[in-house]
Amino acid sequence: MTRKLFFIGFMLFANLLFAQQTKKTWTLREIIDYAISNNLTIKRSTYNVQSGEINLLQSKMAMLPNLNFNGNYGINWGRTIDPTTNIFTENEIRNSNLGATSTWLLWNGFRLFYNLKQSDIELDAANEDLIKARNDVILNVITLYLNVVFNKELYNVAQLQLNTTQEQLQRTRKLADAGSVPLADVLNLDAQLATNEVNVIQQENALNLSLLQLKQALQLPASTPMDVELPQVDISNELLINKTADEIYDIATLSMPEIRAAELRKTSSQYAWRSAKGNLYPRISVNASYNTVYSDQRRQFYPDGNFQILTEEIGYVDGSNATVFRDVTVPTGQISVPSIGDQYRDNRGRSVGVNLQIPIFNGLSARSAMQRAAISRNVADISYLEISNTLRQAVETAYNNALAAGKTYASTERQVKARDEAYRMAKQRYSLGAVNFVDYQLAENNLFQSQSDLLRAKYDFIFRKKVLDFYQGLPLDF
């Protein structure tokens, strides 16, 4: 009883686990969206765009005046200068100072302006790189998706061939038992069945491998249950390509982000050269500063509102040298250290100035930087030509491949129709005993082979056509 309950519990757990691991059927749109959200190259390109945005903001802020605040507090002893009186003292001094400085660069050969333009263009180029990364991921995912669909349909064809052979073997055994066909036909069908089983295993392995490659592209664990939805594709109206390779290339030069990025970087290199050239020109800037100090050695008299009369010696009487005095009325009060707020207010200092810096000789650093920028500009021009040539070659190759794939599909489709009719006739004649088993089996094998070739030609053309659509900036969905 215990073993029975354990077995029932185990089966319930297994069913629950199986339900949790049910394969999810992915559509192409779901695959593309998931790949874009999780691809590491796209994430890296996104960070490059964010970095470009930061650089652009910094270039804008660099055109504004800077502002810095400084302050310190210190204790001095021994012979030192009191900062509030500028007199040497031997006493311990506790002092502090506050200050603010600002500098505004008015002109430096338009370097800041060119840096701003360069940062703006580099941000646009980074956005084009992000678009290219997304396009590359989409094209790669579609390639892997079509490979899965192709292998899935090949597996279905192999399974169908296996089922057909099994049914034929059962019928032939009955006929052999009745003496209508020789036993050799049964043995041949049994051998054919084993061959078909091997073919099913091979196609299943190819399907699993293509699914694994798709999972890896999506950053999914290999153990993730996965299936894909078969697209409903009618390519009969797409076999005719109504544009030439040159027309597709002209469209690609306007739609491909790598071309736009290369053009932008050409312009960016020109602004970089102009910015480097600005180092040869004078710099004009204005600056302003504010500072104040405090010292605990400063003394100040604070009257209390009362007065006292003091006797003051003012001279002598001629002849007798008698001292002459007078009464002086003076306010009374106390001498103490002014508060830190009063000292900061009383000791304020301000300055404004204009600076002019004319470069005369700086170890050729400015001229060398300009020469390096000129070389980078030439390299950007070459990179643009390389990318354009690579794109032209890719478009021409894709165009020829699509034409060949379309012709192959049309020929293979006619072949399937012919072999399907030949198989139908051979099957009828074999059931009537008009042809031998070898001829019948040959017709069947030829039909299934041509069906496999048609699937291969179909998905090869679909892929080639999608590549052409990609170069024209058309949607890649089905």
Model-found features: residue ranges?
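Terminal intrinsically disordered/low-complexity segments used for targeting and assembly
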Residues: 1-10, 14-34, 204-250, 296, ...
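Bacterial Sec-pathway N-terminal export signals of envelope proteins
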Residues: 19-72, 78, 222, 229-270, ...
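Sec/SRP-type N-terminal targeting helices
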Residues: 43-47, 60, 92, 106-134, ...
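Short segments within alpha-helical structural elements
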Residues: 47, 61, 198-220, 414-474
